[in-house]
Structure formats: C-alpha cells, structure tokens
Amino acid sequence: MPINLPSSLSPDSWPFDLELLTPPAYLVGGAVRDALLGRRSHYFDLDFVMLTRAVKTARKIADRTKGGFVLLDAERQIARVVFAGGTVDLAQAEGGSLEGDLLRRDFRINAIAYNPFTREIIDPLDGQTDLRLGVLRMISRSNLEDDPLRLLRAYRQAAQLGFAIEPETQSAIRELAPLLSRVAVERVRTELGYLLSNPDGVPWICRGCEDGLFSIWFESAIDRFDILTKIDASADKLAAIYPQLGKEFGHQIRDTIKTPLLAVAKLAILADSDPTMAEAQLLRLKYSNAEIKSAIGLLKYLPQLQAKPIAEMSFREQYFLFRDVGIVFPVLAVLAVAAGVAVEDISLLINRYLDADDIIAHPTQLVSGNDLMEYLKLPRSPRIGQVLMEIQLARVEGRIATREDALKLAAELVDVN
C-alpha cells in the first residue's frame, strides 16, 4: 500500500525528474533503510534497480541534468550519475526480477525497495522488523561468501546505525573471516576507514579483531586494546581543556586525503608497535605515504613520552619530536593520555604547540641556505643543510638569538670542519 516516506525520498528532492526513469524502477538499499529509520544526510546516495535499460537511463539522466556519467560495469549493466551533492546509481536487476535482486543482498535491512511511481514498499524478507529490533541479520550464509567484504560491512553498519548483529549472523561471520584474504585491500581499507572515523567504531573494531576479521593485516592488535579503547575518551578530555587542539582532531592529513587525524591515531595503535613491522602492514593495505609516515611518527614517539617525565625532555628532544610528527602532534597527545600519561605532563608540549611563536614547536629560520652560501662563499652541498640544522638547534637551546649570531656560528662551524 502507498506510504508517506520522509521528504528526503520524495522525487521532488532528487536531482532529476521522476519522468526520466523508465518504469519499473525501484529505489533500494541504504536510502530506503535510512528513510525508514528517519536518518538524514547532506549527501545523497540513491541506488535504483531497473528491469531494463539501466545504463541508457543513466546516460539520459546525465545528459538532461548535466551530471557526470560513469559506466561502472558494462557486463552487469551498472552506471552512475555524479552530481555536486551526491551520486545516483542505476543497475539492472540481478536474477531478472526485483525480488531476485533483493534476495542476493547482504542483510535484510538492506533488502527493502521503494516504488516511487506507486509509493509502495516492497519488503519480501521483512527487513522492517529487523529495523524495529535494531539488528543486522544476514539473508543467507552464501550471500556473505559471494562477497566476503560483507563481513566487514556488518561491523561498519552496526557502528553506523547503533545496531546489534544477530547471533547466527555473528557466528557465520566468524567462520567465514578467512575469506577476507580474497578481497582487494582497497575495499578493506575503505570499510576500516569508516570504522576508524566513527566515534562508535572502536568497540566494533575490537570485536572484529576478536572474531578474526583483522588478523590477516594486524596480527597483534588485540595486545593494545587498552590504549585503543581509551582514545575517544582521551580526545574528549583534551578537547574540553584545549578547545583549539580539539578542533584539529578532525582535520585531514592533506586536502587530498580524507583520513582524519584521530583515525590515523587509531590506525597506528592497530598496527604493530614496532615501526618497521607497522610500516609493512600499512603498505600491504596500500595506505598513502602521508598516512604511513604519520602513523609511524606516532608509533616512534609514543614510547618516548611514556618512558620518562616529559619535563625532563631536552629542548633538542622536543624540537625533533615536533619536527618529526608535524601536524599529527594533537593526536600524539591523545595517544599519550590514552596510554596513561597525565594531562598535566603532556600540557608542556601542548602549550608549545598551541603557541604559534614557540620556536621549538614552530621554528623559523634565522638564515637560509642561500644566505649561508653567499656569506661563506660556499657551493651548494649537503654541508649547507647540516649547518642550518646546527643553527636551528643552537637557537632552540638558547645559544643564539639573531641573524648575526647565526652567521657567526656558521662561520665557526665551517672553520672547524
């Protein structure tokens, strides 16, 4: 029977006219599920199942709306239209019918369809009951075997929706966990990224480790659950004391890399505590150089913050710490607190970091390499870089303060050598 779904599913809110769809066409998957749960998103992600002409319809929509057309799978007839605010995917029904297509999906809550022409819900597996119960229940074990990434997706969706995983489904996931070795690491990394970025993701990461889902990539992750499970609370604690620091926890490593700093901190703790081993693990998952470098910096310096009182760190040690960890220092502070370092102790470094004029945390050059070459009449060489480093260290240790001091020291260093 016709129903009143939230306005987010009304064709009036879509980036194209309903008349551009060739009936029968059905909205399926997450958009329907989230509408029934009353969940809203600023980014739309609409998936349609069609019995015929899926790719042609996608191309027609793209042409009429000036959207971007992407052919995702010519053989299975799947195409995407890209808009500024989201995406619309159109796919030919697998199994030759809507019901056949729904029966091939992962979980019952994702096997609900909506007919926008009749405003009817089609729910052959009673996924709406699971929505009311707040559970993820597999459609069949064989569906999970067909695409083992669905094993990880269960944990991600449980975290995302605040749902539980039904016991029989949980048991099947544990048994099928070794099949994840067949999945492209890029797909695994995407699902793990969702969990790392979700404030409710850590308990599900821990359960996933216990159930064998991550043992292929992170063999010893369980050993550091004591730190991992305290990261979010430690971040909240520091953000309450240092609001400016807290704002940076969600910053991306780079504009082109969407991983938040706090997610990198969690990733570092999942990886081996030995930086060399951790680097190999992260390379295997094809993380970017920036993500790997950041995680390794955290792993390198966290033990140092635990080993002795921070107040006993020399200016030289502090300088190299800030230089090496760079923009991920805010989450190094989080990891330190999660690992048992007192907030009062780490505050020495936090205050330096938050002071833009602090020459240890944010050093500036008294002289440049060109200045040295001109003043000392030296050619370009690695020695110039070495002298610049000695000047910087002398400055942070309070032995020099001006440009003249720097040039005098440079001359002395060159004469000595």
Residue ranges and their predicted role:
Residues M1-N417:
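Catalytic cores of the polymerase beta-like nucleotidyltransferase superfamily
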